[in-house]
Amino acid sequence: MKEIVSKVKEIAESACKKYNLELFDIKYYNKSGKWFLEIVIDNPLDYVSTKDCENISREVEFQLDKLDIIPQRYYLTVSSPGLDRPLRSIDDFKRFINNKVKIKLENETIIGYIKDVKDSVIFLEENNKKIKEIKYNQIKKANLEIDI
């Protein structure tokens, strides 16, 4: 299974590069006897459109059919990370300055707006307008929050 994911990753990264997109995640798994291949793409400069997903899906599907590396039948989906996307790098925090986030630390969860990122410190404005400094290496999990 690792070999399949590795090969799909190569194919998906190549397809993403062609359309100026980035590969965000790949999952290949069996659920209730059916195989699923989920590819998540990102556009670092804009949003991911349905056309982006369609283009990557066609490219990947074509290459997978041509190379015949997945022996069983599977369902392919291509999507974006979503509105509540995870923030997985310091660059993600920089990219989403002024956006609302939910950050889980060891013993607390904080919701606020990213105001700045310097070195490996995130400056977060909480509801009370107080700025909290959070070291990146203390973050267990972080996601964008939908701001209504």
From Swiss-Prot:
Gene3D superfamilies cross-referenced by the UniProt entry: Ribosome maturation factor RimP, C-terminal domain, RimP-like superfamily, N-terminal
A Pfam family per the record: DUF150_C
Compartment(s) of residence: Cytoplasm
Principal subcellular localization: cytoplasm
One Gene Ontology CC term in the entry: cytosol
GO BP: ribosomal small subunit assembly; translation
Keywords assigned: Cytoplasm, Ribosome biogenesis
InterPro entries: Ribosome_maturation_RimP, RimP_C, RimP_C_sf, RimP_N, RimP_N_sf
Record family assignment: Belongs to the RimP family.
Role: Required for maturation of 30S ribosomal subunits.
Protein name (Swiss-Prot/TrEMBL): Ribosome maturation factor RimP
